[in-house]
Amino acid sequence: MPATAKQKLRAKRLAQLKRFLREHTWGVMITVLIMIALILFVCVIAGATPKEASAPETTQDETPRYESGFICAITTQVPYYTEELSEAGTVARGMQITYSTDRSVERDGVRYYLTYFSTLDCGYVSEENLTQDPSAVIAEKVVYVRTPQNLRLDKNTLELGTLVEKGTELQVLSYEGTTDGVVDLYQVSYQGQTGYISGQYVSTVQEEANDVYDRFGVYAIHAGRGDKWGGGDAESLDYFPRTKASFADNKMPNPCYAIYLTCDPAILKDIDKYIEYAKTTKINAFVVNIMDGTSIGYNSPVYEEYSPTAYQYANNTVEEYQAVIQKIKDAGFYAIGRLTTFNDSFFCQDHPEYAIADGSGDSLYVAASYWPSAFCRYVWEYKVALAIDAVQTMGFDEIQFDYMRFPDGTWAFEEGTIDYRNENGESKAQSVQRFLMYACDRLHDAGVYVSADVFGECAEAYVTAYGQYWPAISNVVDAISAMPYPDHYGASGDW
């Protein structure tokens, strides 16, 4: 085409474009604005500004955008913030997280990184509470005892060491695990002895450890109840709230209707009849004796170690007793193993050094039995070892401690003619409650519940002479059973 013709065609098209723009000016402007808005929207969704989008790509030598790590602190909970550094909530220390190294804000010389707790939850966390070292999750070097406890000498055994009192400072050596920020088990040092203590019994702040729990004035109710009958005062017991155990694979019936069976072979041989009968009623659980004083359920190896006499007089073999409990569980019933705690003549025969004694040092026969002292930790270890063996060997869902007390009827001996083997200077009620804490800790680790049988009297507004006090016991165990006997309601009106 000749040059003149091309110029004429170009001029014609330019004239047409100018005419189109004059006629559609607003439409063109709106279209351009929409395109700009779309570009900005895409940038916001992508988490970057237009300036960031045009930034050069990150090289391998630059800091990566994300790092894996853990929440660390001296406290159980750590705050996280909005981008404006307003507090938005808390997370438990020990949580595994991911944080962005190039999205942070700074205030007062402290940098806060955008931290992801899950796919959807995030917030800004102080650099002081982020670590890539799992051993650095727990920052405290000392803890203070809030609830008096005996240190465990070994994390994997039942042996107990020194009793550490409220407010005692313990040096932290290491720790194992956290649950909602609370340490499962500290390894600590105290007066040259190394041991272990649960994080639920200590505080990182001495003032908090020494404080008495009194929310809603609860403690004040007990503080005025002194030592009326020799069992101790209510003020010295522990009322700090404990979370009751709950196991996904072991549901406690609610309500629980149980039938009780002794461990006599003449009873257990008819287990099929009892199961068939239970199916016709509301019964959903069986209570079976592991031991009842000198009536021994089966020849557990625990008896061989702690009480050979009990082993010798076992009513059933392991296999015979095991078959009974298995039938109960196969039929869909909840299985509760009952054992007498501080009523045990066989043990006192084997270990008179741990028995409650008279003034001359001989084992004291009270209420048709000899009684191991509830003050003696070796007795605690024995009974909890037996309970754990019953859980592991027989498959019980719950352990029920009966005779979980000192003998009643000892008033005549209290004036210097009785030796309770009280090496720690505790009250009766303190030793009973502390035993149950120890038992619950170890049996909960085994995945079962713990219950206690008590006299109905212990619900009165005083600590009983034999060391039972309902509020202190019920604060620890998962279930509590008062024992109202039929003869309490006799026509004579004696009760």
Identify the residue ranges that each predicted region occupies.
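Aromatic-lined carbohydrate-binding/catalytic grooves of carbohydrate-active enzymes
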Residues: 281-316, 408-415
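SH3/SH3-like beta-barrel superfamily modules
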Residues: 92-126, 165-200
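Boundary regions of SH3-family modules and the immediately adjacent low-complexity/disordered segments
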Residues: 56-66, 116-143, 189-244
